[in-house]
C-alpha cells in the first residue's frame, strides 16, 4: 500500500469540500500514515485460517426468568398522581388542537 502524503490529503480534502490549512494538511498526513501502518500490521497478522467475526468475543444475552412480582392496583398507582381522570394520569396539554 502506498504511503499517504500531503498531496493525497489535499486531494481528499478537495473532493470532500473540506478547507484545510497547510499545518492541518501536514498533521493529517502524519495521522493517516499511522492509521495505514496499523491496518498493515493487522492485515499481516490475520491469516486466511482466521474466521471472519463481527466481534472479538462471542455475544450472548444474559436473561432472567420473566416472573410476576408485586403489582399495584390502578387505584394505588393513581393515588400519588396530582391529577387523574377516567383511570388515567391527567397531564397538561402541550400540543395545540386544530
UniProtKB/Swiss-Prot annotation:
EC number, UniProt record: 6.3.5.-
Region called Disordered, residue ranges: 76-98
Any GO MF annotation of the entry: asparaginyl-tRNA synthase (glutamine-hydrolyzing) activity
Keywords linked to the UniProt accession: ATP-binding, Ligase, Nucleotide-binding, Protein biosynthesis
Stored InterPro entries: Asp/Glu-ADT_sf_sub_c (IPR036113), GatC (IPR003837)
Catalyzed reactions per annotation: L-glutamyl-tRNA(Gln) + L-glutamine + ATP + H2O = L-glutaminyl-tRNA(Gln) + L-glutamate + ADP + phosphate + H(+); L-aspartyl-tRNA(Asn) + L-glutamine + ATP + H2O = L-asparaginyl-tRNA(Asn) + L-glutamate + ADP + phosphate + 2 H(+)
Recorded superkingdom: Bacteria
The keyword Protein biosynthesis is annotated on this UniProt entry: yes
Keyword Ligase: yes
A single BP term in Gene Ontology: regulation of translational fidelity
Quaternary structure annotation from Swiss-Prot or TrEMBL: Heterotrimer of A, B and C subunits.
Similarity comment: Belongs to the GatC family.
Function: Allows the formation of correctly charged Asn-tRNA(Asn) or Gln-tRNA(Gln) through the transamidation of misacylated Asp-tRNA(Asn) or Glu-tRNA(Gln) in organisms which lack either or both of asparaginyl-tRNA or glutaminyl-tRNA synthetases. The reaction takes place in the presence of glutamine and ATP through an activated phospho-Asp-tRNA(Asn) or phospho-Glu-tRNA(Gln).
Listed name of the protein: Aspartyl/glutamyl-tRNA(Asn/Gln) amidotransferase subunit C
Organism the protein comes from: Renibacterium salmoninarum (strain ATCC 33209 / DSM 20767 / JCM 11484 / NBRC 15589 / NCIMB 2235)
Amino acid at each position: 500500500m502506498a504511503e499517504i502524503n500531503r498531496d493525497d490529503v489535499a486531494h481528499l480534502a478537495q473532493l470532500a469540500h473540506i478547507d484545510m490549512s497547510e499545518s492541518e494538511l501536514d498533521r493529517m498526513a502524519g495521522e493517516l500514515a499511522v492509521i495505514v501502518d496499523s491496518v498493515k500490521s493487522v492485515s499481516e497478522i490475520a491469516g486466511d485460517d482466521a474466521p471472519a467475526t463481527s466481534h472479538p468475543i462471542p455475544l450472548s444475552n444474559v436473561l432472567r426468568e420473566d416472573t410476576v412480582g408485586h403489582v399495584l392496583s390502578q387505584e394505588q398507582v393513581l393515588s400519588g398522581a396530582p391529577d387523574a381522570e377516567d383511570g388515567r394520569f391527567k397531564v397538561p396539554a402541550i400540543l395545540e388542537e386544530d
